[in-house]
């Protein structure tokens, strides 16, 4: 089946793969930023030691990413006339938005909240049990 799509692929100097799919006559734009980290990725190496996290940590952290500097990112996207969501599979985590409005500000927001490291500020008490007592937990508080 031929969908007659104009697809451009490029790998940036930092390794990020960019895929642009142009669909003529479509009014809506969708942007997705994904990482090859998912539910199966529960081991983390810190200072030469392997820390094994409980399953569910990737999905939990996906939800925590929606809080940027104390604000709910969903509200920030809504103010830009966008809908947003995310998913975590066994092998990847992705964040995306769609809009019929201008894409420059929401694209910058997507890149800012996914790329920029910051300390997580919202860790509910029950989820603290997911983290071992280590410097990792201190970084997440």
What is the predicted role of each segment?
Residues 1-73:
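His/Glu-rich zincin catalytic helix
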Residues 35, 64-141:
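Acidic/histidine-enriched segments that form metal/cofactor-coordinating
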């Amino acid at each position: 089946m031929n969908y007659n799509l104009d697809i451009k692929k490029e790998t940036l100097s930092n390794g990020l793969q960019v895929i642009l799919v142009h669909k003529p006559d479509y009014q809506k734009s969708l942007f997705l930023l994904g990482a090859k980290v998912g539910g199966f990725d529960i081991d983390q190496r810190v200072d030469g030691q392997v820390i094994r996290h409980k399953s569910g940590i990737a999905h939990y952290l996906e939800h925590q990413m929606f809080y940027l500097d104390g604000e709910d990112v969903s509200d920030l996207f809504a103010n830009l006339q966008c809908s947003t969501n995310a998913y975590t599979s066994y092998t990847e985590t992705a964040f995306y938005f769609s809009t019929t409005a201008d894409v420059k500000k929401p694209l910058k927001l997507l890149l800012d909240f996914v790329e920029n490291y910051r300390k997580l500020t919202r860790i509910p008490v029950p989820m603290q049990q997911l983290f071992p007592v280590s410097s990792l937990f201190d970084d997440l508080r």
